[in-house]
Amino acid sequence: MSTTVLPDTWSRRAKRFEGHAKILAVGTATPANWVDQTTYPDFYFRITNSEHLLEHKEKFRRICNKSKIRKRHLVLTEELLKKNPNLCTYNETSLNTRQDTLVSEVPKLGKEAAMKAIKEWGRPISEITHLVFCTTSGVDMPGADFQLTKLLGLNISVKRLMMYQQGCNAGAAMLRLAKDLAENNKGARVLVVCSEVTLSVFRGPSLQQEDNLLAQCLFGDGSAAVIVGTDPRPGLETPLFELVSSAQTIIPDTDSHLKLHLLEMGLTFHCSKAVPSLITQNVEDCLVKAFEPFGISDWNSIFWILHPGGNAILDRVEERLGLGPEKLRASRDVLSEYGNLTSACVLFILDLVRRKSKKQQQ
């Protein structure tokens, strides 16, 4: 890798495009295997040899019933779990076993979504100038971005950025990065890929760590890809969304409420019961800062692509902001059909929103 440094005025004149980045194509993919949420508690406690934990099983059944999730697509199968029983305990050493699957499945699933986006885009794959890849599933080097470059046959000169362990915020963060790359590199076409495989967090129940049950109920596998660029070529590229601005913020003193740690037992998950309240208490301040420059203060006048961290978050945000029932419909539909897809989730919702818009001719 090499970097050439030029005087500031040269680089601004030569490379920057004065305009907003646009999403030019979207693609999504899921594993063929899927589980029914109503029967999953029976499967989960059977495959983890935990059927004797009757109270725990009933609690898990209640969590699944309240989740408003109908099904989830998963790479893990009963065959895989039977071959690797260390995945079915709570804290047995299993990182190597998980990595063996994740390092191949994450880029493979990412390729499926990327190919769909590239097909919709309709331009030669050689015109992709940048690749931004993110996953919370496993860590490897060379990374999943490198593996995807080979799988797709991208130019060896493609500029790559790999983001690991960014969690649910990563989908929106990848759009922000793609916007910056596209607007600061004239003619750039940025391929963004988010690919998630929840094998990293699957494990048996623990009587001491009950929030583990939430992870087993909530997350699904999937990948999503978008192509971002400026100055779409008339007749050759069709812009779907315009990325006008982006921002990110931290709610102070909340880092202990939502945590994932990569350990010998895999990726552990902790989520406090305060998370929905923390989000709803702060969401309107973020909206005001984002939309005030555009004179927008009616939250029902805009379309919504809200990451569904869980049904409780959607309910509370809707109530707090006085949103009509259709405003978060796409988020609820994606949650129902796929579960929480971590980084890929907002891109699945983005895809659903544009498809519904096209169908309704809006």
Curated annotation (Swiss-Prot):
Molecular function in Gene Ontology: naringenin-chalcone synthase activity
Enzyme Commission code(s) on record: 2.3.1.74
InterPro entries xrefs: Chalcone/stilbene_synt_C, Chalcone/stilbene_synt_N, Chalcone/stilbene_synthase_AS, Polyketide_synthase_type-III, Thiolase-like
Active site: C168
Example of a GO biological process term: polyketide biosynthetic process
Keyword check for Transferase: yes
Keywords on record: Acyltransferase, Flavonoid biosynthesis, Transferase
Pathway: Secondary metabolite biosynthesis; flavonoid biosynthesis
Catalytic reaction list: (E)-4-coumaroyl-CoA + 3 malonyl-CoA + 3 H(+) = 2',4,4',6'-tetrahydroxychalcone + 3 CO2 + 4 CoA
Superkingdom classification of source: Eukaryota
Gene3D superfamilies hit by this protein: 3.40.47.10
Family per record: Belongs to the thiolase-like superfamily. Chalcone/stilbene synthases family.
Role summary: The primary product of this enzyme is 4,2',4',6'-tetrahydroxychalcone (also termed naringenin-chalcone or chalcone) which can under specific conditions spontaneously isomerize into naringenin.
Name of this protein: Chalcone synthase A
UniProt source species: Ipomoea platensis (Morning glory)
